[in-house]
């Protein structure tokens, strides 16, 4: 059972997004991008009040994922990536992205000593 409704097309979109955003980070990095994407669909706060589907999350502009602007995102979906996407759509969570709405690529920017930690989520309800 999935934690959000999705179509086959949306599962493929999420799989392509996960690959385009984090293939160089390996399977775990891709799964965490998937967590961020699913969390954005579930969240009803901040920049994500109008995001109600995988498709609207993937193509959100402004404030969405940059990889949709590049040709690599538009390559055909691979079965391995689709299987990873289905895992997060079914509710698998991967720390520290289990409740994250954004992620940070430390390889491209100066890395903060800690970029996650205790946060109050009183305004945000996500399934556990």
Residue ranges and their predicted role:
Residues 32-35, 116-121:
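Short, surface-exposed, charged loop/turn segments at secondary-structure junctions
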Residues 38-41, 89, 126:
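Generic helix-packing signal
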């Amino acid at each position: 059972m999935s934690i959000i409704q999705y179509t086959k097309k949306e599962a493929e979109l999420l799989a392509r997004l996960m690959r385009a955003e984090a293939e160089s980070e390996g399977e775990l990095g891709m799964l965490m991008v998937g967590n961020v994407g699913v969390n954005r669909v579930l969240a009803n706060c901040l920049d994500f009040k109008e995001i109600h589907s995988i498709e609207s999350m993937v193509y959100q502009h402004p404030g969405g994922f940059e990889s949709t602007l590049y040709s690599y995102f538009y390559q055909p979906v691979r079965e391995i990536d689709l299987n990873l996407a289905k895992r997060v759509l079914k509710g698998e969570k991967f720390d520290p992205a289990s409740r994250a709405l954004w992620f940070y690529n430390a390889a491209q920017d100066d890395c903060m000593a800690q970029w996650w930690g205790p946060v109050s989520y009183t305004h945000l309800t996500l399934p556990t």
